[in-house]
Amino acid sequence: MISFKYIGKHGRLGNQMFQFAATVGIARKINKGFVFPKENTEIPSVEDFKDGVTREVYFDLPKYFPNVTMTLAPLDQIETNHVAQEPGFHFFPEFFAIPDQTNLMGYFQTEKYFEHCSDLILGFFQFDREIKKKAENALPKIPGNPELVSVHVRVGDYKALQQFHPVMDADYYFSAMMEFSDKDHNTDKYFVIFSDDIEYAKNLFGESEGIIYMENNEPEVDMCAMSMCHHNIIAN
């Protein structure tokens, strides 16, 4: 059995999705099972950064993706005799040779750890029905079925973490948007703006026919709505 005992203690939803997917992918590659601690969904942890910056984190995945709950077990029932620490932010194929009963540690931010079982991962990452319904209702209904490009402008928590997660500047967003605008002139495109600081985003992009702002949604609804767009411009 392969586990990630610290999931929910190092990183929020996006990081947890990579950590979960990598654990499943590595376990499947070596023909082992996988399991995650139930307690991490109930007890908050404090994530520490340099310079005294902290933030509270939970293991959020089961709350948004109900299928993840079938992978949970009490911590005292998860036996691990080995630890495999990710040495860096690149792909390390050596993880496909770890022994059974290994506890993984790291961020594992590459699909190479789980691309061989992508259908299984997508099965786990099916949003809760209520979240899906809210996302579908929140997305604009535009005649002619144009392509929707989500634009994620993340500002809030990154302001205090600039040395780790720089806020992307206007040049990044406008350059990315131009890539889509120039690619196919025969298809109408609308840019759907998602942000944790919508006033900042409005000052950045202004008002125009091709810009739509998503407001007053929970973060998980925004994420689900982003997944329903045809293309995505991410924040980091």
Task: Show the residue positions of the predicted features.
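A short beta-strand-loop structural module common to alpha/beta enzyme folds
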Residues: K32-I43
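Short, charged/polar "capping" segments at the starts of alpha-helices
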Residues: T41-V46, K159, D197-N203
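Secretory-pathway luminal glycosyltransferase catalytic domains
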Residues: P44-D188
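Extracellular/lumenal mucin-like low-complexity stalks
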Residues: M1-K5
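Donor-binding and catalytic core of enzymes assembling or modifying cell-surface/extracellular glycoconjugates
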Residues: L13, D182-N236
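A short, glycine/small-residue-rich beta-strand->loop->alpha-helix junction that serves as a flexible
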Residues: G8-F18
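Histidine-anchored nucleotide/phosphate-binding helix
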Residues: Q16-R28, F174-S181
